[in-house]
Every structure is written in C-alpha cells, then in structure tokens.
C-alpha cells in the first residue's frame, strides 16, 4: 500500500499513467510529456524541491503543450493532496472552456478507485467568471 501511495504522489508517474488528453484529431490518448513539456516540468520540480514558490511567466508559447502540463500538475496536486484548491484564469471564455474540458477529461478517464469525491457536479458555466474591461 505504501508503494502505491508513493507512486500516486509522484506527479510524473501519475500524469503519464492516469491522465488522458484529446488530440487534435479527437482521439483520447495517455498524456506523455514532449521534450518542451518535460523541460518545463523539470524546472517546476526543481523550484518545488528547493522550497521556492513556483512563479513562471511563459510568453508567446503556442502549441508546446505548456497549458496541458500545468493543468496536469494542478490536477495532480488537487486530487492527491488534502485541502488543496487550484485556480486557473484564462484570457477568454473559449480558453476557459477548453481548460475546463481538459480537466473534466482528466477526471472522467481516471480509474474509479482513484477519483476524488465531488461535492457537486461542475458545469462549464460555473467556472466562467465575468470580468470588467
């Protein structure tokens, strides 16, 4: 049992064994980190191991999968640690919807024995926060 708990707390193991993504051609596949994602993951883990708060600004990164790996890390932290809440803010309602659907797919594809309990079902409209310009 201790080995299983240790593996579930290992973010890379958890992400690559339990989380799934939807590809551009709409296939559902296990999330396997690409080299750029792996570099970002390594930087984040180094900062965490050093006890530093992780603050990363990524400028103009498109189609590298950075949002996916960040979302996967947030999901892992949220479902494997007690009293952890995460928040992602997107620049548009379309981006918010995309991130919400990614998170929902992570949850839906988890083995039932690993799914955290939910107080209530969330809908996309629950997650969109209006903002003033």
Tell what function each PLM region has.
Residues 1-133:
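Phosphate/NTP-binding elements of NTP-utilizing enzymes
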